[in-house]
Amino acid sequence: MNTTKPSPATAAELLRASPLDALDARILLAHALGWSRTQLITRADEPLDAAARARYLALQARRAAGEPIAQLTGAREFFGLEFDITPDVLIPRPETELLVETALDAIDGIASPCVLDLGTGSGAIAVSIASERPDARVWALERSVAALDVARRNARKLLDPARAGGPLRFLESDWYAALDPGLRFHVVVSNPPYIARHDPHLAEGDLRFEPRGALTDENDGLAAIRTIVAGAHAFVAPGGALWLEHGYDQAAAVRTLLDAAGFADVESRADLASIERASGGRLPG
């Protein structure tokens, strides 16, 4: 008598048999099948062909080995937009939406504001600001050519074509290096690498698969922030603002750097987990 258990043949059976977190399994199965999440419910008992099952099982194995969902699906939602993601860019996190909200607050009421995003990566911050403020002139700087390619692709996909090639400008640059010295911005924002070189988190979870240069400054976690703060006076307009994302335990240190650099109204803002996640200040003038 054949007692071999049959392989899962439907979406419902694959999900029940999956060793993954239920949400991860649903996301990957929908991606493998090209279905919406609603279709996973309405077509749950529909037989799947061998190729479809194989696609899902390959993704399941990679996720079980730790690969990030965003890299497996090639996408991540951020600020209501779906960004293309590759292993060349940092995966946008929900807490970084605070930086976008803060930048939008800083330019509220300013006509055609100038915005600078340093270390744009996937373009999540710059594209989100440009989407919310079509009148804004946004510069997005990034030293990684591969990351810039992803950012440009996201701009083309998510913004009006006129914006993707015009008021949103991408430059290959190591922080401020490629900027015209005469430029001034109403707000400068950055989510720089702020994890210290020896932080054990770099060897854990999704971070193992993301570009190391977007995560750590290969120093104490504040080196990139020091560079950005030190150069800000040359590019922040009088009365303009500088805002930086940082680690959960770095707010006080970043405020000290901003105070020492002569910024006024220095403060930190907490994310939805009540963690001080962004700090900034205003340049007097």
From Swiss-Prot:
Any one Pfam family match given in the protein's UniProt record, by short name: MTS
Reaction equations catalysed: L-glutaminyl-[peptide chain release factor] + S-adenosyl-L-methionine = N(5)-methyl-L-glutaminyl-[peptide chain release factor] + S-adenosyl-L-homocysteine + H(+)
The protein's enzyme class: transferase
Methyltransferase recorded as keyword: yes
EC number of this enzyme: 2.1.1.297
InterPro entries named among the record's database cross-references: DNA_methylase_N6_adenine_CS, HemK-like, N5-glutamine_MTase, PrmC_N, RF_methyltr_PrmC, SAM-dependent_MTases_sf, Small_mtfrase_dom
Keywords: Methyltransferase, S-adenosyl-L-methionine, Transferase
Reported function: Methylates the class 1 translation termination release factors RF1/PrfA and RF2/PrfB on the glutamine residue of the universally conserved GGQ motif.
Name this protein carries in UniProt: Release factor glutamine methyltransferase
Species whose genome carries this gene: Burkholderia pseudomallei (strain K96243)
